Amino acid sequence: GKVIEFVPTIDEQDLKVKVLSRKIIESEVDFDTPRTIVSFGRGIKDDPEQNVKLVEQLAKELNAEIGVTLPISKKPYVVSSVLDSKYMIPDRVIGTSGHKTSPLLYIAAGVSGAMQHVWGMKDSGFVVAINPDEDAPIKDECDIFIKGRMEDVIPLLIEEIKKQMLVVEA
């Protein structure tokens, strides 16, 4: 082989950036007006795909917005690209790294209750927490604590809501 010496040259023109277009992307997430928010955290870990779908179904029954904890926005679990791009995003984070909200009803499913998250939901009217760990900090922040795994509890809640034909207006 033959070694060829190359000395790159960079001039001012090489360093210029030209903006071709700008687009403002509006968030589709609304935590200011919903009466109900269902949030989920790392408790989805046993079956992330199915558990996110359960949260989605519960939120639909309650006409609720869906929130997440900060760790979820960092995509620690594999779910379909549709669910990933819809829910596991920074726009949905409740807490010091995201939104502060005050719905009438806040359901925390699989949320441990780190103080950063609690800051974002502490002004909620009524808080229901679902967590298998009875020592989870969220227990001290809720009105009703349901000890159980979200995949066991949420289907029962959905069934009961349907039985009672509960309607929550937006």
Report residues per predicted region:
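N-terminal glycine-rich FAD/FM-binding segment characteristic of electron-transfer flavoproteins
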Residues: 1-170
